[in-house]
Design a protein with these regions (language model features):
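Active-site beta-loop-alpha junctions enriched in small/polar residues
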Residues: 15-17, 61-65, 92-96, 120-124, ...
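Conserved, mostly hydrophobic/aromatic
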Residues: 2, 10, 40, 58, ...
Length: 222
């Protein structure tokens, strides 16, 4: 369907048979975790065969509940499928922030696997150590939470550094805004978020910024 629609990248989730073992207690044998990544490869290699056949890429969103949910699980997921080119990542920094993962470093280290970009923001609210990162079974927007999703540009994601990193790796794919904010009306927040993201999409230079000085120096000494 994606190919018929002219779409070359599909964003989605993989699922995970080992997510219930996240807490690692009771102790989980390493073999169980390894079997989980093997299960991922067994299920997804045939799917990726179809993607390859259609010339379409799959951009997995690094997200809790999935086989690749943070930095090292992303490394391991790629290893499990022998780094197939059909499989890459949807870079969504909102889920990295509350896990204390550097979203800019993720771009740099997975430069050839950033297939899609989701602009979604997170604001951290540690509350002097009262709230943890797992949400405390509190609903979105509850001020007691340790973090929450907010309109893009209103949180703690280092957006300028992130877009500079995307420019540096030559990213030219889709950029979408995934808007969530329990404390802001979407008809106000979504257009504001769009304007904010557009303000970061400046043209990259075609030459070194000091090239003009070099030319001037050359001209003076000619």
């Amino acid at each position: 369907v994606a190919r018929k629609l002219g779409v070359d990248t599909v964003v989605g989730f993989t699922g995970s048979s080992i997510w219930p073992y996240l807490a690692m207690f009771p102790p989980v044998p390493a073999s169980v975790i390894e079997a989980g990544f093997d299960d991922f490869a067994t299920r997804w290699n045939p799917i990726l065969d179809v993607f390859d056949g259609e010339g379409v890429r799959f951009a997995h969103e690094v997200h809790p509940g999935e086989i690749a949910y943070d930095y090292w699980s992303s490394v391991r997921a790629l290893d499990a499928i022998d780094h197939r080119e059909a499989f890459g990542f949807n870079w969504d920094p909102s889920h990295m922030m509350w896990q204390n993962i550097d979203p800019v470093g993720f771009i740099v280290d997975f430069a050839d696997r950033i297939y899609h970009v989701d602009c979604k923001d997170t604001r951290m609210r540690p509350h002097n150590g009262r709230a943890g990162v797992l949400g405390s079974h509190l609903p979105w927007g509850d001020p007691r939470r340790g973090w929450d999703f907010v309109s893009t540009g209103h949180g703690d994601v280092p957006w300028e550094d992130s877009f500079r990193a995307l420019d540096a790796i030559g990213y030219a794919g889709p950029i979408s805004i995934e808007w969530e904010d329990a404390g802001m009306d979407r008809l106000h927040g979504a257009p504001q978020a769009l304007a904010y993201v557009r303000s970061l999409l400046w043209p990259v230079p075609t030459a070194s910024f000091d090239a003009a000085f070099s030319n001037q120096t050359t001209g003076d000494t000619a």
